[in-house]
Structures are given as C-alpha cells and as structure tokens.
C-alpha cells in the first residue's frame, strides 16, 4: 500500500524543502516530478541498493517521460573518496549533463554524502534529491545539507553545505536492511533523545524491541520524530555555528574510531554509540550527569545491539585524531557533552587528562 504517512518541512527560506516519509513511495514519481528542472535525471546508487530499488525508481520516472542515467558505485565507507567521487563526475560529463539536470542519491549515508557533494560541485551546483534507504540516512544524514568525502586523516573533512530539493524516505526499504545496519541507525535515533528530546528517549526505552523487529508504525514514528528534531535544528542553525553542533554527540570520538580503525571496519552508527558512551563518561567525570544516567544510556545501546566499549587505539591516538575535528576552535578541542538526558552542550571544559581518563575507562 502506497502511503505518505508524514510530510515535514525544513524551513530555510527560498531553499526550504519537504521530507516525505511513507511506505512504498519509491514508485510514486508524482512526489519527485515537481522538483525536476528537466526530463532527465542521474541516479547515483551502489552495488547493494541498485539490484533492490533502482528499477522501481527508474520505471516510475520513465513512465512519466523522464530519462534516467544510473551511476552505480561500489558499496562501503572505504569508497567515500576522491576516486569514487570522480566516477560520478566522469558519468555526468560523459552524458553531457547540464547545470539543471537533477541528481538523485539513492542509498545510505555514503551515497547521500557523495552524491550531494558531487551535485554541489558539478558546474558549481546542480539540483539534487535525497532518497535514503537506510535507517541512519533516513533519520539523519539525508536531512540538513551536509555533504562530504573522507580524507585519510579524518572523516568528512572535504565537503560542502548543500541542501537537497526533496528528501523521500521510503520505510519499505528498511525491510531489506541488514540487521547490523538497522542497529547502527538506532544510534542516531537515540542521539536525538539524548541531546534535546527527553520524552523521545523515554519512548525509545519503551519501544526499542518494536524497532528491532521492524514494526512499521514504530519505525514511522521514530523516523518522523528524528527528522522533526533534525529539521528544527537545521532551520535554526544551517551552518553549524551554534545549536547544530549538538547533533555531533558521540561523533568526535566516533570519527576517531572510524579513522583509526580504517574506514568501513566499524559502521558509523557503531562508532557513534561507543563515542557517545565516552562522552557520557566524560560528562559524569565533570560532575554534569550521574553514574545512573551513564548506566541508563549504556543499557539502551546494549539493548540495541551496539558496542558500548571503544576499540583501544591508545588515548594518544584518539587525541591526535580528534585534533582534526571540525569543532576545534583556536586550536582548542570542543566536545558535545551531556548536562542531563535530553540536554547537551558544546564545551571546552574538559582537560586533556580528563579526556584521557574517560577514553581509557570506556576502551576494551
């Protein structure tokens, strides 16, 4: 049954755009057609998603007279590179795509990030649409206009803020999502409860098992509430000069894990979960949250099947990797920490010694 369960709006003035969340909406081209500037689109996807959903998306568009050019990339965080990005540019140039050709990113966070960055760069900007197919991308990375590729020295270090024209989140794509990917997506869902929505955190504690068994109504609620939180934050602080930085809870430590282990060894959500526990540990050591709160946070990640212990890269290696973090200001590392469950702050209050202690306490 094709249904749009909810539509949200990311309010950015002339660059505002809708988020359609529904079931079997990939085959509803009428949701996409109003956002196309010409009768040709490029669909950037990967080798895992293409066999599942590319034909469904293409057939609906082609029945409406829209020519589709697929660009199928290798799957994995390790391919979020200049080399893979250039494959997109090669395809765009070979097909003589124009500035008003629309690029559709069909896939998870890696495809959305790379497709969006390619769109931001090609002929100095072409329109693009996000069609996220993983829980993580539906609740987080597809909304807000962050696009990037990785660098050997740090994750998402080369990129741009570039907003999509539309986000189309089809909950049906979660049916084929591997369990590990579903669990990884829950890390970003839980994040919203921790940083700004304590009632949502309570709901997640009560409904986590429903999400793990892919209950459609529970997933629809979680995706909608996560996107509503993200849309509010992005509308207030598009370029991450203030409140938007709070969305990076667990990410400073998490990005260090991903870079230190090698891209693709841990999924992004897995690294964020372990990183969030380090941040919670540090918040506790600063006297901002109590040990019971840390235990409560750890419990929901354990129930989600996510790692709560970080890999032992060595505290010095963590600090080295974190020194490249995008929140560093005047050479000083700023971290997203918790004042309570449901309230986060960006702070440079932690000393190096306190960071080391927290890292060592949460490493295996």
From Swiss-Prot:
GO MF: 3-dehydroquinate synthase activity; metal ion binding; nucleotide binding
GO cellular component, as recorded: cytoplasm
Enzyme Commission (EC) number: 4.2.3.4
InterPro entries in alphabetical order: Dehydroquinate_synthase, DHQ_synth_AroB, DHQ_synth_fam, DHQS/DOIS_N, DHQS_C
Reactions catalysed: 7-phospho-2-dehydro-3-deoxy-D-arabino-heptonate = 3-dehydroquinate + phosphate
Cofactor: Co(2+); Zn(2+); NAD(+)
Function: Catalyzes the conversion of 3-deoxy-D-arabino-heptulosonate 7-phosphate (DAHP) to dehydroquinate (DHQ).
NCBIfam families per UniProt: aroB (TIGR01357)
Protein name (record): 3-dehydroquinate synthase
The organism of origin for this protein: Dechloromonas aromatica (strain RCB)
């Amino acid at each position: 049954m094709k249904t749009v369960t909810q539509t949200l709006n990311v309010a950015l003035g002339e660059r505002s755009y809708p988020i359609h969340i529904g079931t079997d909406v990939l085959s509803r081209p009428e949701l996409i057609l109003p956002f196309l500037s010409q009768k040709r689109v490029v669909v950037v996807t990967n080798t895992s998603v293409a066999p599942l959903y590319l034909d469904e998306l293409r057939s609906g568009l082609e029945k409406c007279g829209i020519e589709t050019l697929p660009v199928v990339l290798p799957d994995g965080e390790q391919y979020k590179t200049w080399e893979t990005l250039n494959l997109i540019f090669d395809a765009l140039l070979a097909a003589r795509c124009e500035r008003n050709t629309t690029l559709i990113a069909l896939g998870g966070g890696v495809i959305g990030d790379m497709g969006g960055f390619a769109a931001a760069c090609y002929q100095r900007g072409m329109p693009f649409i996000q069609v996220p197919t993983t829980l993580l991308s539906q609740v987080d990375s597809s909304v807000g206009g962050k696009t990037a590729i990785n660098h050997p020295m740090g994750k998402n270090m080369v990129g741009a803020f570039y907003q999509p024209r539309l986000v189309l989140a089809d909950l049906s794509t979660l049916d084929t999502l591997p369990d590990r990917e579903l669990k990884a997506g829950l890390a970003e869902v839980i994040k919203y409860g921790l940083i700004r929505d304590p009632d949502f955190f309570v709901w997640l504690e009560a409904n986590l098992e429903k999400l793990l068994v892919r209950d459609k109504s529970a997933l629809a609620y979680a995706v909608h509430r996560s996107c509503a939180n993200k849309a509010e934050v992005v509308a207030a602080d598009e370029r991450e000069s203030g409140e938007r930085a709070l969305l990076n809870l667990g990410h400073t430590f998490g990005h260090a894990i991903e870079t230190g282990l090698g891209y693709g060894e841990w999924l992004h959500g897995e690294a964020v979960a372990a990183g969030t526990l380090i941040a919670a540990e540090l918040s506790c050591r600063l006297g901002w949250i109590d040990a019971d709160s840390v235990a409560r946070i750890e419990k929901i990640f354990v129930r989600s099947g996510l790692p709560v212990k970080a890999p032992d890269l060595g505290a010095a290696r963590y600090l080295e990797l974190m020194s490249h973090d995008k929140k560093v200001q005047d050479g000083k590392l700023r971290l997203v920490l918790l004042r309570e469950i449901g309230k986060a702050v960006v702070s440079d209050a932690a000393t190096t010694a306190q960071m080391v202690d927290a890292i060592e306490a949460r490493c295996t």
